[in-house]
Amino acid sequence: MRFSVVFAAIAALSSVVTAERGCGAIPHKGFATELMEAMDNARASSFSNTTAANVTINTYFHVITDGNKGQINNDTLQKQIEVLNKDYSGTGFSFKLVGSERTNNAGWASGNDDFGMKSSLRKGGYDSLNVYFVPMLREGLLGFCHFPTKNPGKRQLIMDGCVINSNTVPGGSAQNYDEGRTTTHEVGHFMGLYHVFNDNGGGCQQDGDMVDDTPVQSKPSSGCPKGKDSCPQQGVDSIHNYMDYSYDSCLNEFSPGQIQRMQMLWKQFRAGNSNRSPKAMKPIIPSYVSDPVM
């Protein structure tokens, strides 16, 4: 996930072949520490995913267009929420599309004012999911999403949510990434999941995602490479896991450990901040944010 997330207006992913799933999600600086504390808290309380209640997440879709660029019809938005619910079935989470809106804004469509876009459009509290579909992310970048934090400030509340290349929705033009699973992948970051491969440059020497039941994996997958095994430790690479970079058609699972991780972090980070929203906090001075890291 160590990819630049600075938007550029110079390239649009319209009917192009994407070589690899480009993800720009980067955990905020304190996330690793907060994650370790959350894991300690969960162990102390004997938490397991079987004790967590089912959660319905209010979801808002924002379609950003520049004229005809980025248009997504209602049927496609419905298919996207159906993909999300199918992929998260069995996790304890479901998604209710409570609102969708379209905004024609050339600057937002080209990624020139991420903060301005979100501060104007974001809805709901910290337990709501906002997804912004934009047509012109930097070439090779299909999306990014913000990791949760225990005590979000107003800027973090505003910037929360996922930005998705509009060509990746079901039936879109991002070849091999046109079944809506970029949104599934990025929402995994919203829930607190790392990539299954090692983002820290540690090769096979580190467990990159800190989940016990995902085998150590040194690099992302591309395509659907059956039997790929990038590390000598037990287990082959998780090519079918939603948090890898495989083609959409190859992805079909979260591990039990990932499900428990999502349940744990939801309970400690998002459910506890359900009443917090940007509108309920003191105003801050807007500024251009080229990097969404908090």
Curated annotation (Swiss-Prot):
Residues 1-19 form the signal peptide. InterPro entries: MetalloPept_cat_dom_sf, Peptidase_M43. It comes from the Eukaryota. GO terms for biological process: proteolysis. Its EC number is 3.4.24.-. GO terms for molecular function: metal ion binding; metallopeptidase activity. Coiled coil: none annotated. Keywords: Disulfide bond, Glycoprotein, Hydrolase, Metal-binding, Metalloprotease, Protease, Secreted, Signal, Virulence, Zinc. Its main location: secreted. The active site is at E186. Disulfide bonds join C224-C250. It is found in: Secreted. GO terms for cellular component: extracellular region. Glycans are attached at N49, N54, N74. Zn(2+) binds at H185, H189. Belongs to the peptidase M43B family. PANTHER family: METALLOPROTEASE MEP1 (AFU_ORTHOLOGUE AFUA_1G07730)-RELATED (PTHR47466:SF1), PTHR47466. Secreted metalloproteinase that allows assimilation of proteinaceous substrates. Plays a pivotal role as a pathogenicity determinant during infections and contributes to the ability of the pathogen to persist within the mammalian host. This is Extracellular metalloprotease ARB_07495.
